[in-house]
Amino acid sequence: MKINHAVSARDQGAHLNKSDFGEGGIYPILYSFFDQNGALDRAAWRQQIEAVIQAGAPGIAILGLITEVSALSVEERRTLVTWAREDIADRVPLLATIAGKDLAEARALAQDAESAGANALIIQPPLNVKCDESELIDFFSGIMKSVSIAVGIQNAPEYLG
Protein backbone atom coordinates (compact mmCIF):
# COMPACT_ATOMS: atom_id res chain seq x y z
CA MET A 1 0.00 0.00 0.00
CA LYS A 2 1.31 3.42 -0.88
CA ILE A 3 -0.08 6.44 0.90
CA ASN A 4 0.33 9.53 -1.23
CA HIS A 5 -0.83 12.05 1.31
CA ALA A 6 -0.98 12.41 5.05
CA VAL A 7 -1.25 15.10 7.65
CA SER A 8 2.05 15.76 9.34
CA ALA A 9 2.46 16.98 12.89
CA ARG A 10 4.19 20.03 11.41
CA ASP A 11 1.04 20.81 9.43
CA GLN A 12 -0.82 20.74 12.73
CA GLY A 13 1.52 23.26 14.36
CA ALA A 14 4.09 20.97 15.98
CA HIS A 15 7.60 22.10 15.21
CA LEU A 16 10.48 19.73 15.66
CA ASN A 17 13.80 20.95 16.90
CA LYS A 18 16.88 18.78 16.99
CA SER A 19 17.11 19.59 20.69
CA ASP A 20 13.73 17.90 21.21
CA PHE A 21 15.33 14.56 20.43
CA GLY A 22 18.80 14.75 21.92
CA GLU A 23 21.88 13.89 19.93
CA GLY A 24 20.30 11.04 17.97
CA GLY A 25 20.90 7.34 18.24
CA ILE A 26 18.81 4.31 19.12
CA TYR A 27 15.84 4.71 21.43
CA PRO A 28 15.24 1.46 23.31
CA ILE A 29 11.64 0.26 23.51
CA LEU A 30 10.93 -0.79 27.07
CA TYR A 31 9.40 -4.04 28.27
CA SER A 32 6.35 -4.27 30.52
CA PHE A 33 7.04 -6.01 33.82
CA PHE A 34 4.45 -7.61 36.07
CA ASP A 35 4.60 -8.76 39.67
CA GLN A 36 3.50 -12.19 40.94
CA ASN A 37 -0.09 -10.91 41.18
CA GLY A 38 -0.19 -9.86 37.52
CA ALA A 39 -0.04 -6.11 38.25
CA LEU A 40 2.40 -3.76 36.55
CA ASP A 41 5.68 -3.75 38.49
CA ARG A 42 6.66 -0.13 39.17
CA ALA A 43 10.04 -1.00 40.71
CA ALA A 44 11.08 -3.10 37.71
CA TRP A 45 9.84 -0.38 35.33
CA ARG A 46 11.87 2.27 37.16
CA GLN A 47 14.96 0.03 37.23
CA GLN A 48 14.69 -0.50 33.46
CA ILE A 49 14.45 3.25 32.82
CA GLU A 50 17.46 3.95 35.01
CA ALA A 51 19.46 1.20 33.28
CA VAL A 52 18.87 2.50 29.76
CA ILE A 53 19.52 6.12 30.73
CA GLN A 54 22.73 5.15 32.53
CA ALA A 55 23.76 3.15 29.44
CA GLY A 56 23.50 6.34 27.39
CA ALA A 57 20.17 5.97 25.59
CA PRO A 58 19.39 9.32 23.93
CA GLY A 59 15.66 8.76 24.48
CA ILE A 60 13.13 6.11 25.43
CA ALA A 61 10.19 4.63 23.52
CA ILE A 62 7.38 2.79 25.27
CA LEU A 63 4.29 0.76 24.44
CA GLY A 64 5.63 -0.76 21.25
CA LEU A 65 5.20 -4.32 20.10
CA ILE A 66 7.89 -5.54 22.53
CA THR A 67 5.90 -4.00 25.40
CA GLU A 68 2.99 -6.23 24.35
CA VAL A 69 0.84 -3.14 24.09
CA SER A 70 -2.11 -5.06 22.64
CA ALA A 71 -2.25 -7.20 25.82
CA LEU A 72 -2.32 -4.16 28.13
CA SER A 73 -5.54 -2.51 29.21
CA VAL A 74 -6.11 1.14 28.32
CA GLU A 75 -5.56 2.03 31.98
CA GLU A 76 -2.27 0.09 32.09
CA ARG A 77 -1.07 1.97 29.00
CA ARG A 78 -1.92 5.29 30.61
CA THR A 79 -0.13 4.22 33.79
CA LEU A 80 3.06 3.33 31.91
CA VAL A 81 3.14 6.71 30.14
CA THR A 82 2.72 8.50 33.48
CA TRP A 83 5.37 6.36 35.18
CA ALA A 84 7.78 6.85 32.29
CA ARG A 85 7.48 10.63 32.37
CA GLU A 86 7.88 10.67 36.17
CA ASP A 87 10.88 8.33 36.14
CA ILE A 88 12.60 9.91 33.14
CA ALA A 89 12.19 13.33 34.77
CA ASP A 90 13.01 15.20 31.54
CA ARG A 91 16.48 13.62 31.30
CA VAL A 92 15.77 12.20 27.82
CA PRO A 93 12.85 12.46 25.36
CA LEU A 94 9.90 10.07 25.72
CA LEU A 95 8.15 8.56 22.70
CA ALA A 96 4.86 6.80 23.42
CA THR A 97 3.32 4.29 21.03
CA ILE A 98 -0.43 4.65 20.55
CA ALA A 99 -2.54 1.60 19.73
CA GLY A 100 -6.31 1.73 19.97
CA LYS A 101 -9.21 -0.40 18.83
CA ASP A 102 -10.72 2.57 17.00
CA LEU A 103 -10.10 6.25 16.29
CA ALA A 104 -11.86 7.49 19.43
CA GLU A 105 -9.75 5.29 21.71
CA ALA A 106 -6.50 6.04 19.85
CA ARG A 107 -7.21 9.78 19.88
CA ALA A 108 -7.91 9.70 23.63
CA LEU A 109 -4.69 7.75 24.29
CA ALA A 110 -2.70 10.19 22.12
CA GLN A 111 -4.10 13.18 23.98
CA ASP A 112 -3.45 11.50 27.33
CA ALA A 113 0.17 10.76 26.35
CA GLU A 114 0.68 14.35 25.23
CA SER A 115 -0.85 15.65 28.48
CA ALA A 116 1.37 13.30 30.49
CA GLY A 117 4.45 14.80 28.82
CA ALA A 118 5.37 12.54 25.90
CA ASN A 119 7.65 14.36 23.47
CA ALA A 120 6.35 12.48 20.43
CA LEU A 121 4.04 9.64 19.46
CA ILE A 122 4.40 6.49 17.39
CA ILE A 123 0.98 5.47 16.11
CA GLN A 124 -0.10 2.01 15.03
CA PRO A 125 -3.09 1.03 12.87
CA PRO A 126 -6.28 0.15 14.75
CA LEU A 127 -5.90 -3.04 16.76
CA ASN A 128 -7.41 -6.18 15.21
CA VAL A 129 -9.15 -4.28 12.40
CA LYS A 130 -8.38 -4.59 8.68
CA CYS A 131 -8.38 -1.17 7.01
CA ASP A 132 -8.08 -0.07 3.43
CA GLU A 133 -5.81 2.82 2.43
CA SER A 134 -8.49 5.48 2.79
CA GLU A 135 -9.49 4.24 6.25
CA LEU A 136 -5.85 4.23 7.39
CA ILE A 137 -5.35 7.79 6.17
CA ASP A 138 -8.48 8.90 8.03
CA PHE A 139 -7.38 7.03 11.17
CA PHE A 140 -3.82 8.37 11.22
CA SER A 141 -4.77 11.94 10.29
CA GLY A 142 -7.56 11.88 12.90
CA ILE A 143 -4.98 11.15 15.59
CA MET A 144 -2.49 13.69 14.23
CA LYS A 145 -5.11 16.44 14.22
CA SER A 146 -5.85 15.82 17.90
CA VAL A 147 -2.33 16.50 19.23
CA SER A 148 0.33 19.16 18.82
CA ILE A 149 3.43 16.97 19.31
CA ALA A 150 5.35 15.11 16.62
CA VAL A 151 3.85 11.87 15.31
CA GLY A 152 5.37 8.94 13.42
CA ILE A 153 3.56 5.92 11.97
CA GLN A 154 4.75 2.42 12.78
CA ASN A 155 4.91 0.16 9.75
CA ALA A 156 5.02 -3.50 10.81
CA PRO A 157 2.47 -5.28 8.59
CA GLU A 158 3.65 -8.74 9.64
CA TYR A 159 2.51 -7.92 13.19
CA LEU A 160 -0.07 -5.19 12.76
CA GLY A 161 -1.73 -6.16 9.51
PLM features per residue range, with description:
Residues 4-161:
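Active-site beta->alpha loop and helix N-cap motifs at the rims of alpha/beta catalytic domains
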